[in-house]
């Protein structure tokens, strides 16, 4: 797997200060995509053990609230295979330790053009490692960017069809109801100041 870019101290792609990994490769090709330079699977540089280690080191800073994975398309089958071991390393190094407000100490966000349904068994991008990967992710921003639905007031997403899914709450709801994650979606709740005011 290649990566197109790593942004340290990123505040645009998830809550708080984060390290954001932009993987290379996307077959979707959404018109108006903000990162079309990462569509090629050959773009950027190889995602090596040394790069993994540097990202994990960056997450160790107390001011860093977590990792964001975007692209490109993280859920392309090749990229899932390239990411799963790394994401499991991150989750093992930074387990879901709960803060007094109930949030995990370090969160993992993932932006994908797939809907959650497409990542379920029999879905377009379901692979042998999809469940392992989703099991490490806290917030999944799902759905393709649709230029006609672009809305500058939206936080952490570009078009109104995209959802910010709280996968931890969704997993709990799915277990309680005995159904798939896609049928038990719980949306992430933004802070009230952002939820009620345009950006």
Please provide the spans of the model-predicted regions:
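Conserved Radical SAM active-site core
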Residues: 1-4, 17, 32-124
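N-terminal pre-triad scaffold of radical SAM enzymes
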Residues: 2-29
């Amino acid at each position: 797997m290649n990566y197109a870019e790593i942004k340290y101290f990123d505040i645009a792609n998830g809550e708080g200060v984060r390290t954001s990994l932009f993987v290379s490769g996307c077959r979707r090709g959404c018109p108006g995509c903000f990162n079309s330079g990462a569509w090629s699977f050959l773009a950027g540089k190889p995602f090596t053990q040394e790069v993994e280690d540097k990202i994990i080191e960056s997450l160790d800073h107390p001011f860093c609230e977590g990792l964001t994975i975007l692209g490109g398309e993280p859920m392309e089958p090749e990229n899932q295979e390239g990411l799963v071991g790394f994401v499991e390393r991150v989750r093992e190094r930074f387990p879901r330790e709960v803060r007094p407000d109930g949030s995990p100490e370090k969160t993992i966000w993932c932006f994908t053009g797939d809907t959650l349904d497409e990542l379920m068994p029999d879905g377009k991008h379901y692979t042998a490692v999809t469940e392992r990967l989703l099991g490490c992710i806290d917030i999944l921003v799902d759905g393709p960017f649709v230029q006609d639905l672009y809305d500058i007031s939206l936080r952490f997403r570009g078009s109104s069809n995209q959802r910010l899914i709280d996968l931890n709450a969704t997993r709990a709801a799915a277990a309680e109801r005995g159904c798939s994650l896609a049928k038990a979606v719980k949306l992430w709740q933004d802070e009230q100041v952002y939820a009620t005011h345009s950006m």
